[in-house]
Amino acid sequence: MHCWAEDNTLQNQAESSAENPVLRLAVVSDNPELARQLNLGLECCLLNYQEKARYHFRQSLAADDACMMAHVGMLMVHPSGSPEYKEHLQALNALLDTAMLTPVEEWYLSTFLQYIAGDLQGTAAAFKKRAEVYRRDTMAACWDIVLNHYAAEQGGNIVSRANHLLQNHPDNPFALFCRALLDEYSSSPTVEALQAAQKAAELLPGNPVLHLLYGHLLRRSGRLEEAISQYRAARMAATNELEFINTADAVTCHISSLAKASSCWQAGRRIDALRLSFELSKQVNDGAGEGDILMHWEGRTLPLRLLVLQPTAPAGTAINAAAKACNAPVGTPVRHVQDCLVAAIQTRSLAESRRLSTATQTLLKAEQHLSELFKLSDDMNRAGGLRLTCYNRALQACQGAILRARIALYADSKDIWQTHLDELLSKPEARFLPPVLPEFNKP
């Protein structure tokens, strides 16, 4: 039995619930559990809550292993080339050979496959066109906003579409999410975006991604204590869902904690931030899950990256403690990150104590480790996914640490290096998915 779309409309459930989908693609099946799990999975994909989406798609396939949309969903949330990806691609190809597809099912399948193939611009354009033609297709309208935001559409047109969607569905948490998401990179999020994010989190209080986005916008607005509260709520919600999610894949849970530590630092609660960072560094596992990968890069190095932001050069004991907490395995890319950050921080301490010759030699070590990181660019681009995101963030953190060291060491040219640092900090950090991120470069 297939999972078939019934028509070209999606039903918008009046009442929000964590157990039942809000956006519902009508499917032909004698098993209501299949449709429920499939739509919950598609909602999680929309939010890029990938670890929870995997759970729902697995449940869909347990109900009917011939559900083509569930196989497509699995392709969306597994890295290409992984054993899981190959398994579901093979299953999908076998089903497509004999399938009789309805037009809407064929459209969604082909468009999501276009997305899986990496054609973000084409997929975004397709959903935009569909949302214009089929005004009742709320899911298409949401995908239009999210994908075109990722594709870097700017200006009033996308905001207008998001506002129109929200006017038609004022109590739909996904329409609210779409409007809030558009202010993700704004240095001053609008009142409309903040209100949308708040209402979305209130409608689905058990969804950690919505708390993350609201916390992110609050932090961007300077409302740091409120942001910390939202990150705490996100962590609690994500922890509650670990019964469905392998801890090794718990990206959202870890991002909540990383963002909380970052916000504590930004709020001036530096003791709290450092305490949290050392706690997180103890939660690192060198496994292959996406949560493990995230913590290997971000959790390990967090104490060092916070010390980089300290206005005055840290004491040697603090540097040593942070390096010990990192303890990256020798020969790994993260070890270059660790050694680069340590050398850059030490350079500042040496410069402040006027040991300029030793400081210069130490800075050279930091620059050498950064050079080694740059040599890994091709490998990381081939790996893609979360590894590439973490690698790009590590590069930016190391560059910022070295520029701060140069400012401390080269007094005669510190204005030049400060300009370079300001330029670096003005660039958006590499995106984490879900689409919120802890910012560690800014003091």
Protein language model regions, located:
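Residue-level recognition of tetratricopeptide repeat
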Residues: 33, 67-68, 103, 136-140, ...
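Structural register within alpha-helical repeat arrays
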Residues: 33, 40, 74, 110, ...
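Structural motif corresponding to the intra-repeat A-B loop/turn of tetratricopeptide repeats
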Residues: 47, 81-82, 117, 151-152, ...
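Short, charge-rich amphipathic alpha-helical segments embedded
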Residues: 51, 55-86, 132-145, 150
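Alpha-helical repeat scaffolds
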Residues: 85-98, 121-131, 155-168, 189-202, ...
